[in-house]
Amino acid sequence: MRATEHPSACGWTAHSPRTYFASPPTDLLRRGAAGASILLMLAVCWIGGAEAKVVSSDAAGFSVEHQVTVPAQPDDAFSTLLDVWRWWDPAHTWSGDPANLSIDARAGGCFCESLPEGGSAQHLLVIYAEPGSTLRMVGGLGPLQDQAVSGAMTWSVAPEGEGSVITMTYRVSGRVEGGMEAWAGLVDSMLGGQIARLADLLDD
């Protein structure tokens, strides 16, 4: 699978909580039809070369899933997945530099980011790690950290022919202003971009 790059040339970056998923849906929804148009534009721009798949979405939560097939063997694919700094889009970090990202793949470890001036951010908390196979983390990505939600993200890697199939699911439930439906497409588009970048790296 080859994917389109996802630069920040769409007109924004994501180096603060307010822009991690582009402009927060609640802000845009308050602008009525104009805000809805902007929300749609952002989702289309972020989708890039990855196909969005919102499995379900309602007022209580949403579930998204993405799957790619890569030529790498499961152990190599999983190892590259853990090298998150190599493929995570810098436009979707707090610091703007993916070199600050790391995944400590053990229960109690985290997908974390070092911030300037000695700060740090926890993107997700690792609750299950099986080398070469499964990584499960919990938490709210980006501005979802500041909302009354819970989220569970699972990455699974399985043999497929001479390569591997990588599946990522992210399930979020809780309450946010404007309703969960407003967030589903943006989160799905962002995550679709990340797995596409991972697939590109594994295709090289």
Give the role of each language-model region.
Residues E5, C10-T13, P17-S37:
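Bacterial N-terminal signal peptides that target proteins for export
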Residues G35-W46:
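Bacterial N-terminal signal peptides
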Residues G49-N100:
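Hydrophobic ligand-binding cavity/cleft-lining segments
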Residues A60, Q147-T154:
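Amphipathic hydrophobic-ligand
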Residues H66-V68, Q122-Y128, G151-P159:
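Hydrophobic/aromatic beta-strand elements that line small-molecule binding cavities or substrate pockets
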Residues R86, P90, G96-G142, D200-D204:
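Glycine-rich portal/gate segments that line the openings of hydrophobic small-molecule binding cavities
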Residues G118-S120, P143-Q147, G174-G178:
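Short, cysteine-centered beta-strand-loop-beta hairpins and adjacent loop/turn segments enriched
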Residues V165, T169-D204:
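A conserved amphipathic terminal alpha-helix motif
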